Amino acid sequence: IPVRSPFGVTYGNKPVIDSTYSTLKEFPNRQLLGEDVIWNGNDEIGYHSSHRILSKGTHLGKGFYGEPTGKDIYYRVIADCACKNNQVYDEWIVRDQGAMVRQIGYSPEEFARKMIEKEGGVSNSSKLYDANSDKNSDYKAESYKDGSIAEKYTQVLSNIFNKSYEYEDYDRAANLFWPGNKLGHGREDIIEKWNSIKKIFTNIKFSIEHVGFLEEPEKNPRVSVRWFLEGEHANESDEYGKIGRAHV
């Protein structure tokens, strides 16, 4: 099983098991509160689930996040899993690390520096996920119909990054959950947050990698989209730091 995260790609179930034990050692009272699951598939072809989880716990043990602080934290995780024959065989996962370390007492920059130092410096540090990382998978996404909500929302995201967009597809009372446990209310906050990414990068390349969708009786249709963004870090911001000129 390949597991892809911002920290890179691991293979097999042992890294997953080790990571779970490590997390439980640091946060022994951790709870996983399911917020939503968007799934597709059947027993014959297998299933794909995109699940959004709110994790909460108390930092009580020494480990990846340093000495125990006794602080209560919460953060969100989104995982895309392909499953067949009661086994996960492909996974993508992203965790709100910025929210975690801020609540524990670090800034993201401070924590990143500690990680690099612990690994023996930049030249010895782990390779993070990038455009050249392994994306090969036996999983084949289910196609969506023309004119469907899945097509509509992928087009919204493409418009945000590829053209001048007026955000007319967002309701004026829409909410936005953003990394760092940040919450936006209304169209103005949504525009501000998306623009905060667009402003710091040049030579942006945006692509859609996977679309999950779910339409159920008497419920609003839901869509999960995994997308990939590349660009040059060319402008400074309070949220994303000083100009690095790095390809991100």
Identify the function of each model-found stretch.
Residues 1-247:
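C-terminal and inter-domain tail/linker signature
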